[in-house]
Structures are given as C-alpha cells and as structure tokens.
A protein has these predicted regions:
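C-terminal flanking tails of non-heme Fe-dependent oxygenases
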Residues: 4-104
Length: 104
C-alpha cells in the first residue's frame, strides 16, 4: 500500500463498488475492500448497498462509451452475478464472481 491509498484524517471514505466501475466503464475503479482496526481508535462503518432488480442486466452507460472508449464489459445479469458471488462468499461452492470475468 502506498501513502496515496490512505484516507486523509477525518475523511469520509466511499467504496463505490463493482457496479459503478462497470457503469463508468472503468473511469471510477472499485477499490479493494480492506479495513484496518486499531485497538486504541474508534472506527465507524455505515454500509449502504444499492442493488437492482434481479432481472437487470447492467453494462457501461452510453455516456461512458464512445469511439475512443468502447465498452469494457459485456452485460452482466444481476441475478447470475449475485448467485455466483454468494456461492463464492458463503458456500465456497464455486468460483468467486468478479467483474473481470465479464470483461470484453
């Protein structure tokens, strides 16, 4: 980890997640989730998750692609993605789903 990866003191850190990375066609990369716990300091987390309907296919937004920036992901079905992610997270019954598996 380099010093530019560390949040500023008192800053609010927002983990945008994989969906925004796909929507933005990699303009806004999702960071690796990692938390550092310090025994002598308080740490507050307020998770908020936005999930589309399971029938949703998400892909780079039209405003994020052009002739110089073609789509970097094929459409990702949310139900399929979440099922694969859950299998990797909880059941350990398969490959952990990553957006890189949908890269073009």
């Amino acid at each position: 980890m380099c010093s530019s990866d560390l949040p500023l003191a008192g800053a609010l850190t927002v983990n945008i997640g994989d969906m925004v990375q796909v929507w933005s066609n990699d303009r806004y990369p999702a960071p690796l989730h990692r938390a550092f716990v310090h025994a002598d300091e308080d740490r507050f987390s307020v998770p908020f998750f936005f999930n589309p309907a399971y029938s949703t296919d998400y892909a780079p937004l039209p405003s994020a692609i052009d002739a110089r920036n073609p789509p970097r992901y094929r459409p990702i079905n949310w139900r399929e993605f979440r099922a694969r992610r859950a299998a990797g997270d909880y059941a350990h019954a398969g490959e952990y789903a990553e957006i890189s598996q949908y890269a073009i």
